[in-house]
Amino acid sequence: LGKGLGGRVKPDHGEKEKPEMKYSVFSLLKNTLSGHKKWPAAWRDPQPQKDYDVIIIGGGGHGLATAYYLAKVHGISNVAVLEKSWLGSGNVGRNTTIIRSNYMLPGNNPFYEWSMKLWEGLEQDFNFNAMVSQRGVLNLCHTDPQRDAFARRGNAMRIDGVDAELLDAERVREMYPFLDFNNARFPIKGGILQRRGGTVRHDAVAWGYARGADSRGVDIIQNCEVTGIKTVKGKVVGVQTNRGFIGCKKLGLAAAGNSSEVAAMAGLKLPIESHVLQAFVSEGLKPYIDGVVTFGAGHFYVSQSDKGGLVFGGDIDGYNSYARRGNLPMVEHVIEAGVAMIPGLARVRVLRSWGGIMDMSMDGSPI
């Protein structure tokens, strides 16, 4: 983000930094005695100031995490996070909650493994229960060449210090006997398992980062939509919002699928496309799927939530869109793959589906 941002640890926003109540079993017992009526707000609802050292557009996982680490690691707390809707209303609250680092390429593997290590210490770090559940992620293989490719991936992972296990069909059957092992078209040959992968409560991730950033002086401003970016001689000096102009020295963009629209306000054309990715949840079932299972013969992945619903998804919709809704042919496509992997899904009712907007780079790598 550059130098000369002041490095102020305590905020100078015309009000004192609020003390953070540390969540613990003792605070839980204390508030139980008062009927849970004296819990302080997890974060403030401040009015926008005239200017900040840093403004971050997007109050989702990436935007809130950026603000949190700026304040915690770099001592830069004169920061505002601008969210056009409510906090966590975008992709951080719309995904299928899977965390993993089972990648192969040199650029991807260390990047996602660093992320996995952050997940493993995240709850202690920001003192919030994000319900990180390292229940394992299993990718199925259905052909001999695919099994060889998984062996190659697993070896690459282990060279980089990432856990990986190559399982044969019998070991997979022991773990998940309800899979269709006798499917003549897609016989299960085995799979690659990362035991440290799993799921996390996505809303709690946003809440935890928001609480941690707010306690360090960051202003989290909801219902504040950026409508323009002001530049002077090619340098960003602030943003125009539906709540007035806000000046800044540095501007961060964490708007996910709307990144191209926001960047265009500053005259930038990003080399990305925006696509809808749908997700689904079923009716509640008894404990059924212990971990995360992905289909190797089609794009389908499924896990089970703490409420018993099966959370699953598949391919992105093939057309470009900024709308957070998908189309019915993709619903059929995803569930078709799910039933091919788990025939019992045919008898399960789907409660609802929703969509999130993916900002897709041409090579699948972050910019």
Where are these regions (language model features)?
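Glycine-rich FAD pyrophosphate-binding loop
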Residues: 71-92
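Helical element adjacent to the flavin cofactor pocket in flavoenzyme catalytic cores
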Residues: 191-250
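Dinucleotide-binding Rossmann-like beta1-alpha1 core, especially the glycine-rich loop
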Residues: 96-178, 299, 329, 337-339
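Central helical "cap/lid" subdomain
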Residues: 241-290
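Active-site lid/adjacent beta-loop-alpha segment flanking the redox-cofactor pocket in flavoenzymes
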Residues: 284-367
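Extreme N-terminal leader/targeting segments of oxidoreductases
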Residues: 18-54, 69-77
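Glycine-rich Rossmann-fold phosphate-binding loop(s) that bind the pyrophosphate
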Residues: 59-62, 84
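Short beta-strand to alpha-helix junction loop
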Residues: 110-113, 140-149, 192-211, 221, ...
